[in-house]
Regions:
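N-terminal targeting leaders that direct proteins to extracytoplasmic destinations
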Residues: 1-8, 164-171, 175-176
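Periplasmic peptidoglycan-binding/anchoring modules of Gram-negative envelope and division proteins
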Residues: 2-11, 20, 25-67, 87-90
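Extracytoplasmic
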Residues: 13-15, 54-56, 98, 165-167
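Residue-identity detector for threonine
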Residues: 14, 29, 121-124
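Soluble periplasmic/extracytoplasmic beta-strand elements of cell-envelope proteins
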Residues: 17-21, 58-62, 102-104, 167-173
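Residues that form or immediately flank small-molecule/cofactor binding pockets and catalytic motifs
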Residues: 25, 106-108, 175
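Periplasmic OmpA-like peptidoglycan-binding domain that tethers envelope proteins to the cell wall
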Residues: 66-170
Length: 176
């Protein structure tokens, strides 16, 4: 005979770049590429819902912000955006999933910023090292943001890198 091990728990995730107006949390399907991103997320939800061998334990929705602005305000903004996306998607999930939609917050996505800066091909090596030094030795995110704002590369970072930090992650926790 042959033994097959089936894991009881399963996990899947995806990330969407959902645009929000500055300082706002409303889901606007007409803003940026939101319509196609939200459609992609809805398709992902449909695909997971169609997996008859799995049941959903939770779908955790976590919105993250870029570092500009006070950390405390970004915490509130992240929570408000996560909740707005949860409410929006509530109309598109199976009825039995509605209570399984959870929200989480990531006020400022410094880990992703570190990756983006490390992999950037526009900024010079010296600038990258200085920026990474600020990020990696950060004790207070608001102080770190003020230090970054003093660098000549800050405008580039705000225009090209920071928008990539404003994302929403979807974690599907499932079981057999």
């Amino acid at each position: 005979y042959r033994m097959i091990v089936l894991e009881r728990r399963a996990y899947d995730n995806t990330k969407a770049l959902i645009d929000f107006a500055q300082g706002r949390s409303e889901v606007d399907t007409a803003l940026g590429d939101n319509a196609s991103e939200l459609l992609r997320i809805r398709k992902c939800i449909e695909d997971v819902a169609s997996l008859s061998q799995f049941a959903l334990d939770s779908l955790v929705i976590m919105a993250s912000c870029s570092p500009e602005g006070a950390y405390s305000l970004n915490r509130r903004l992240s929570a408000d955006r996560s909740e707005a996306v949860r409410k929006y998607l509530g109309d598109f999930v199976p009825e039995e999933w509605k209570d399984s939609l959870k929200v989480s917050v990531l006020p400022e996505n410094w880990e992703q910023l570190e990756k983006l800066v490390s992999n950037d091909t526009v900024m010079t090596g010296d600038a990258v090292r200085k920026i990474l030094d600020v990020i990696r030795n950060m004790k207070d995110p608001d102080v770190a943001e003020r230090k970054l704002a003093g660098f000549p590369e800050y405008r580039y970072m705000r225009e090209k890198l920071y928008p990539k930090l404003r994302s929403v992650k979807f974690d599907f926790h499932l079981h057999r």
